[in-house]
Amino acid sequence: MKRTGSKSVRALAAVAAIVSLFALQTVPANAGGVDFRKAVPGSGKGLTIGLIGLDDAIGFGKDVHDSIAREAKKAGATLIFCDGKLKADLALACAKTFKLKKVQGYANFNAVADAAPAICKAGPQVPVIAIDIEQDPCQAAFMGADNANAGATTGKALGEYFKKNFNCEYDAFISLEDYGVGIANELRMGGYRSGFASVCGAIPADKLKKYDAGRLDKALEVMPAALTTLPGKSKIIVVAINDQGIQGAFSAAKQVGREKDIYAGSQGAEKSVWCDIKNNDHWIGATAYFPERYGEIVVPYLIDLIKGKKVPFQLKVKHIAINGGNIEKYFGKISC
């Protein structure tokens, strides 16, 4: 039986559709997060490791890449990076390159979950750590989000905000999803709803509006029409599978003069949106994934796997809800 982990990010790219599509997958009980551990200098000397990147054009993906490169260098390992750019065919080509380059282990941030079997087959038969998206059947460990808990963290923050400010009254709950990333979408977006419901009760079906539009470009496309269906409404909740979806939502709302009508929650809290979170009091929460520290989990555990050491399958990040009031507590002084 397959073990199911979790996911991250703009690309990353409903519930019923995903349940049907991934009927053979099972969702494990939530495991506690692991602590970050910096690579031990010299621990990777003589080793060659690989990284199939999400997309370096995306802030989250670039932060992950940079952190893994930093820790690999510290460990003394040679890192071969290949950017998947959100495309299955490019990720497949990366795996083939790793085989030719004789990498001894690699991390895979391929964005297309159903392409994982082909990628696993094409690549070298070495230890693999999946990042944020399932990479069955070859993943030896899953590193990334505890998706259900990540969604619930900011979903609850939204519920608490609406309870305090509006007595839990709202006009719509717009969910910008990414069906292409598999069960991670169901867990993360369902987590938003369960977290919100824990404070304000279940979301009525007529208020829930779901779109396959978690990415920046997709959110820019669908939000104007979505807002058109809600004329005169000023308490609209918008959640997205990543930060970029919410950037797109606010940009689209601003174009039609309605940026103050939406209240948002996102996933990632990546560096590229820190100023947005700090300065926009309608960006109620963003679940922190700390992509700039992913390398502090991926690199030391991948080296352990290559050396034959036992590693927990679940290597999940400990999530925190970030907002304008606490962002500098966790990320330091932010100059915007």
Range-by-range predicted roles:
Residues 30-48, 176-177, 184, 290-336:
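Hinge/cleft segment of the Venus flytrap/periplasmic-binding protein
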Residues 47, 75-78, 101-105, 124-128, ...:
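Loop/turn elements at helix/coil->beta-strand transitions in domains of secreted/extracellular proteins
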